[in-house]
Amino acid sequence: MVTFEVFRNEVLSAMNSKPKKWRDGQFVFNYIDEKYGVARSVQFIDGVDCFYVDSKIEEFIARSYEYIKNAELSDNY
């Protein structure tokens, strides 16, 4: 299990490869959705949507991490 800071840095570093026409939040949403599959849970269950609202990126990353961490913990039991 990676730490939150490692996860956050991974996502933010990946933004260096985002398409120029994409907003940061759009990239973060798609990156997390493609790599971890939790973006729609954060968007629809938690109501945090960085796809359209870039100011929600940090909260979106934090909530995504919680879903990933909880999934990994439940896989270990």
Question: Model-derived features: where do they sit?
Answer:
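N-terminal acidic leader/helix
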Residues: M1-F29
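Acidic, low-complexity, intrinsically disordered interaction modules
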Residues: K20-A62
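A short glycine/small-residue-enriched secondary-structure motif
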Residues: Y67-I68
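Low-complexity intrinsically disordered segments
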Residues: E72-D75
